[in-house]
């Protein structure tokens, strides 16, 4: 059986492909807006996409925050956001449609917050 030699992208490789903040925010907005929510059938796909956005954004924000001084407020806020996003990634889907929507909305809020930190730290 072959073993995988896949490795996470280096910082330089990630810099070559910046996050698509606009697409990430659009996906989050779909669950946070007053518009009709996705159907129960679509919700799993939407939640999976939000989780993928978080997986991509966390290392980027973590790296940018890590460049700041240890006592910088922006660093502390970004690290708290990362911790919250990781915690939300561990949440299990609920048994009811309302619980599944609530979980997906929490993921969407984390995506938005990570996008905010990505944009704010990029100008550092």
Residue ranges and their predicted role:
Residues 2-46:
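Short terminal alpha-helical segments
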Residues 33-37, 63-70, 87, 91-95:
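General structural signal for alpha-helix termini and helix-helix connectors
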Residues 44-48, 72-79, 98-105:
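Short, charged, amphipathic alpha-helical segments
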Residues 1-5, 121-124:
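Short intrinsically disordered terminal tails
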Residues 40-59:
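Short, well-structured hydrophobic secondary-structure segments
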């Amino acid at each position: 059986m072959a073993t995988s030699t896949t490795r996470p992208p280096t910082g330089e490789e990630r810099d070559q492909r910046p996050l698509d903040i606009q697409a990430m925010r659009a996906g989050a907005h779909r669950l946070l807006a007053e518009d009709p929510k996705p159907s129960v059938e679509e919700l799993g796909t939407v939640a999976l996409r939000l989780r993928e956005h978080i997986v991509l954004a966390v290392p980027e924000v973590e790296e940018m925050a890590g460049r700041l001084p240890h006592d910088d407020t922006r660093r502390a806020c970004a690290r708290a956001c990362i911790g919250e996003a990781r915690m939300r990634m561990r949440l299990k889907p609920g048994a009811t449609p309302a619980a599944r929507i609530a979980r997906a909305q929490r993921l969407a809020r984390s995506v938005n917050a990570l996008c905010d930190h990505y944009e704010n730290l990029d100008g550092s």
